[in-house]
Each structure stands twice: as C-alpha cells, then as structure tokens.
Amino acid sequence: MSLNPVIFSIGPVSIYWYSLAYVLGIVFAYWYLHRLDDQKIFTKNFYDSLLTATIVGIILGGRLGYVLIYDPVLYISNPIEILKTWEGGMSFHGGAIGVLLAVIISCRRHNIPIFYALDLVSCGVPIGLFLGRIGNFINGELFGRVTTMPWGMVFPESGDNLLHHPSQLYEALFEGLLLFAVANSLFFLTRIRLYHGALTGIAVMWYGIARFFVEFFREPDYQIGYLWLDLTMGQLLSIPMVLLGMLVYLGALNLKFNTKSVT
C-alpha cells in the first residue's frame, strides 16, 4: 500500500495530508467547544488565547516529545530534522502535555475553571486523534506487526514486502472514533459533567487502555524495540496515563467538582 502524502505542491511548497489532519482537528475542536459550552463560561478572549496556546502546545509538545522519547540520537546529530514536522514524528504523549499546559495557562489567565474546560476539550480532542492517525496511515508510518489476516497491508517503509496490521486504523478507531462516542455519550446522556474532571479522567483512562491494547498489533519503533517485560515504549507510557486518569476520575467524584462551584 502506497499513498501520496502530498496533497499538492506549488513550486517548492508542498501541502501534506498529515499537516491538514492537524489543522482540521484543531478547527473542529475549536468549533465544538463553542457548542459544548452551554453555560457560556468561555469568553471570546479565552477562545483566542486557548487556540493560540493549543497550536503551540501541540507542535512543540508533540515534536519535542517524539525527539526526546523516541529518537534523541538521530535529532542530536541532525537537529535540522526537528523542524520537519510535516514528515511525521509527533508524540501523542508530548502533544497531550502541551495541550494540558495550554488549557491550564489559558484558564488561569481568564479565570475559567480548569477541569470544566478539560472536560469539554476531552469531548472534542478524539476527532483530532482520529484525523492524526489517518495522516499516519497515508504517510505509511507507524504500521503494525506482520500478520496473516486478510486485511493485512504491505507498507513500503517496512522494507520486507510482507503483510502488516494497519495499526494506524485500529488507533483511529479505538483512540479516536470510539473515544469520541463514549465521551460525548457520557457528556450528553449522563450527569457526569456535574463532576468537573470526571470526564477528563475517563478519557485519559480510555486512551491509555486503548493505546496499550493496540500496541500489541503495532510494530515497535525500530530505534527502541521492546523494553521491560517485552512491552513497547507506547505501552509503558500508557500505564501512568491509566493510573493518572483513575486518580483524576476518583478525585472528581470525591471532591464533588459540580456545577454549583462554577462562578
């Protein structure tokens, strides 16, 4: 399977599907926040501040996370490669930290309840994750392990001409579409949003569990391979995510972050 990662080129400038995925994900989240904020707590200045901070957080956090966690040697020897974000190489965990900091900073600047904002962000972010994984699929990167299943695909970057799991699509489903469905079903059909932070905790737990599971089908990063107990880096990073999500969820229920505390 080989798809052209470039949408079109104008002279030396090329527009990539991967980059478009990020743009569409951010635009959707920005639009969706407006619809979810039924209490009208967010101001225009807050939206503008959050949008700017989120873009910076995703790019810097995602790229630096990948550089530091997955391939520091390559980027130390070729630092110019750090700037080539359109070629892929973004860490979800780094990007998540970047988005978290963006939300915290924007909320503090505009006196917005942090966990109220994080719950709403958790409802929109999964679509960005879905689009990002589709971008990975088009790039032919982050493919799965060798398989005999009929839906296996040949990825040129594997260099072996064997069938591999299209693990990018698995992640797009479990970390993207299903998380979006679960988070929004809970938001609209239950009273969980009365406990600010509970939905954030569930979303973080869901992602960690989904990522841990899908990693069993995903080819480990060639420069890292298998680590402790034959787990991948993605799985090891997902374990603290699940624990953190559980703590946030239980804390939200115990501390009763409900709408009465919103001022």
Curated annotation (Swiss-Prot):
Gene Ontology MF, one: phosphatidylglycerol-prolipoprotein diacylglyceryl transferase activity
Task: Give residues annotated as binding a 1,2-diacyl-sn-glycero-3-phospho-(1'-sn-glycerol).
Answer: R133
The protein's matches in InterPro entries, at most eight in alphabetical order, are given as: Lgt (IPR001640)
Q: Write down the membrane topology.
A: Multi-pass membrane protein
List UniProt keywords, sorted A-Z: Cell membrane, Membrane, Transferase, Transmembrane, Transmembrane helix
Metabolic or biological pathway: Protein modification; lipoprotein biosynthesis (diacylglyceryl transfer)
**Protein's cellular compartments:** Cell membrane
Indicate the family of this protein: Belongs to the Lgt family.
Q: What is this protein called?
A: Phosphatidylglycerol--prolipoprotein diacylglyceryl transferase
Q: Which organism is it from?
A: Wolbachia sp. subsp. Drosophila simulans (strain wRi)
